[in-house]
Swiss-Prot record:
Residues 12-118 form the MTTase N-terminal domain. One of its GO terms (biological process) is tRNA methylthiolation. Catalyzes the methylthiolation of N6-threonylcarbamoyladenosine (t(6)A), leading to the formation of 2-methylthio-N6-threonylcarbamoyladenosine (ms(2)t(6)A) at position 37 in tRNAs that read codons beginning with adenine. Its EC number is 2.8.4.5. [4Fe-4S] cluster 1 binds at C21, C57, C86. It catalyses: N(6)-L-threonylcarbamoyladenosine(37) in tRNA + (sulfur carrier)-SH + AH2 + 2 S-adenosyl-L-methionine = 2-methylsulfanyl-N(6)-L-threonylcarbamoyladenosine(37) in tRNA + (sulfur carrier)-H + 5'-deoxyadenosine + L-methionine + A + S-adenosyl-L-homocysteine + 2 H(+). PANTHER family: RADICAL SAM PROTEINS (PTHR11918), THREONYLCARBAMOYLADENOSINE TRNA METHYLTHIOTRANSFERASE (PTHR11918:SF45). This is Probable threonylcarbamoyladenosine tRNA methylthiotransferase.
Length: 427
């Protein structure tokens, strides 16, 4: 069927849907804009499309299964399907017979598809060449009220459970000048919130003699009223630049939001996960942030049921969480991922994982509500996202009446819910 489309790129309509993290969300937009540049019409309605591109996530087994189900669903609807993102890179054999677009090729999506349609030729994937100009992904970002801003690709970790490293590879940081120039462009064209994103923002620059604190400091000097949310950091890398990081966090343009995954509150499990820090080292980072950054919103991730995790080790995790009281906990049952070291370890019964997940969910709700109650009576700066909703300057969701989209307003918090706040405009 592909040959039917020879020489008719200008008439072709492409539907794109994406899944996964903020970094993948950015890639989905990059794919769309690359397609437009190369003459394709991007449509929002699947029924109108000749081709469907699915930008996949593969972080968990159930996510992988959902992706494969959706791919087959699109195929059965009679669409030509292109599989992009982490799934084809990490588990190529699972999606044989489809055209693939890998994470580091998102900005080349239009060129790849055009070549395939017109010549039935798949451009070779030469990662060394792609890595040299990977920063050109930034050229395909367009402004919106909230805009993801990727700063690097890959990471320097080697966590024993993680398939994303297989999909996204080692660290390639974008030049600071390129990021800052793109941020200026986005803000000048109306962006009010930049989501600074990467697999691990804390390792930014380690490969090019730079670091995240330097980047953030330069970004804060951009003129205009805007706020940045710094994405997930690995604790072992954040620790290396901790003092500089906390200093730049005191700038009003840096949201008081810290996403620092703990994963386990037991040192033996952390060692087997290859996380590279101890529980005490993790606590020290969080406590130092809280000591110097007022109203810090601390978010963390926890994996329950990691291979070999005993009941005592699980209880150790709960105890650490009760002590640190994160504002929000992303809890997940351990997922066995092909090609990872942890997949070869002795696995825990799924019923035990499920029970521990339920216990964690109850605790995370309790802690979230406990934290949110502290804000009742406080006046907070809020970015209005849409009618009746906004982000506080530490990225809690607050509901209120009034305000124009894109404005920064003062809101007094009047009530707290488990995962959000209520308030009223005062300025």
């Amino acid at each position: 069927m592909w040959l039917y489309y020879l020489q008719v790129v200008m008439d072709m309509r492409v539907y794109v849907e994406g899944y996964g993290c903020v970094l993948n969300t950015a890639d989905t937009e990059i794919i769309k804009n690359s397609l437009k540049k190369h003459g394709f019409e991007v449509v929002n309605n699947l029924e109108e499309a000749d081709i469907a591109i699915i930008n996949t996530c593969v972080v968990r087994l159930e996510t992988e299964n959902r992706m494969i189900y959706r791919i087959n669903e699109l195929k059965n609807l009679g669409k030509e399907v292109v599989v992009a993102g982490c799934l084809p890179k990490a588990l190529k054999n699972k999606v044989k017979g489809f055209l693939h677009i890998y994470p580091r090729e998102a900005h080349k999506a239009g060129e790849i598809l055009k070549n395939y349609v017109e010549k039935h030729y798949r451009m070779p994937y030469i990662e060394e060449d792609i890595n040299k100009t990977l920063y050109k992904k930034l050229d395909y970002l367009k402004p919106s009220l909230i805009t993801p801003l990727p700063i690097c690709e890959g990471c320097i970790g080697n966590c024993s459970y993680c398939i994303v490293k297989i999909a996204r590879g080692g660290l390639i940081s974008y030049p600071r000048e390129k990021i800052v120039n793109k941020a200026k462009e986005l803000i000048n064209k109306g962006a009010k919130c930049l989501l600074i994103t990467a697999q691990d923002t804390a390792c930014y620059g380690f490969d090019i003699g730079d670091n995240l604190a330097n980047l953030l400091n330069e970004l804060t000097q951009i003129k205009g009223e805007f706020i940045m949310r710094v994405g997930m950091m690995h604790a072992k890398n954040a620790e290396l630049i901790l003092d500089e990081l906390i200093e730049v966090y005191q700038n009003e343009k840096v949201g008081k939001f810290l996403h620092l995954p703990l994963q386990s509150g037991d040192d033996e499990i952390l060692k087997r996960m290859k996380r590279g820090y101890t529980v005490d080292e993790f606590k020290d980072i969080v406590n130092e942030f809280r000591r110097k950054i007022k109203n810090l919103c601390f978010t963390t991730d926890i994996i329950v049921g990691f291979p070999g995790e005993t009941e005592e080790q699980f209880q150790n995790t709960l105890e650490v969480l009760r002590e640190l009281k994160p504002d929000y906990i992303h809890g997940a049952k351990y997922s066995q991922r092909k090609g990872t070291e942890a997949a070869k370890m002795k696995q825990i019964d799924t019923k035990i994982r499920k029970r521990r997940s339920e216990i964690l969910d109850k605790l995370r709700r309790e802690l979230s509500y406990l934290n949110n109650k502290k804000y009742i009576g406080k006046a907070m700066k809020v970015l209005v996202l849409d009618e009746g909703k906004g982000y506080t300057d530490n990225f809690k969701v607050v509901k209120f009446e009034g305000g124009e989209v894109g404005e920064f307003r003062k809101v007094k918090i009047t009530d707290a819910k488990t995962f959000g706040l209520k308030g009223e405009l005062i300025l």
